[in-house]
């Protein structure tokens, strides 16, 4: 059975949806008896410093040909295409969301990320995505063939005990505070039901201070 390396930029213990997904993926692979080694890449991705890009290239190019490397899309989409093309290990891409679709990117940077991610995905033996929507984006815009895509939907563990009813109800929205998460859509919808009593909490790091 091939050894698996999992390359993730930054601290995998970070409390965000993407990192929680990564941790659960690593856990499930371990429960299946797979040997998995975590490779921590620099935390500057998707805009890596020269040092972080160089360190990542050295670590990834050193992986043996009889191994598998899963690279989180936050890093893979911004990597030098020549480095990715030279990988000896079998590449599996994990794409949470295409980098070029993030908000607040100028045209030049958006085009650069789109091109690098499209090229790098072309080298992946398999691509893991969290939703059919992301899968369709990669098929239609990034030339990823459907037979290479695995949709692994995220989920939550079933809670113990019986949930208590709250009055008024609490509406909880969890996710990083950036435009594509749509917290503003939720707030506008809630503003239209002022005749009802409710509480709402938005929980997640403010990665876009102006939006938050």
For each predicted feature, which ranges?
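N-terminal subdomain of nucleotide-sugar transferases
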Residues: 1-43, 63-67
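Glycosyltransferase donor-sugar binding loop
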Residues: 199-212
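N-terminal beta-loop-helix "entrance" segment that forms/cooperates
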Residues: 42-60
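Short His-centered aromatic/hydrophobic patch
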Residues: 71-76
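Carbohydrate-associated surface elements
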Residues: 133, 152-155
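Membrane-proximal helix-turn-helix segments that form the acceptor-binding/catalytic region
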Residues: 99, 108-127
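Conserved donor-binding/catalytic core segment of Leloir-type glycosyltransferases
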Residues: 156-158, 162-181, 187-192, 200-203
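Active-site proximal beta-strand in glycosyltransferases
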Residues: 67-70, 84-102
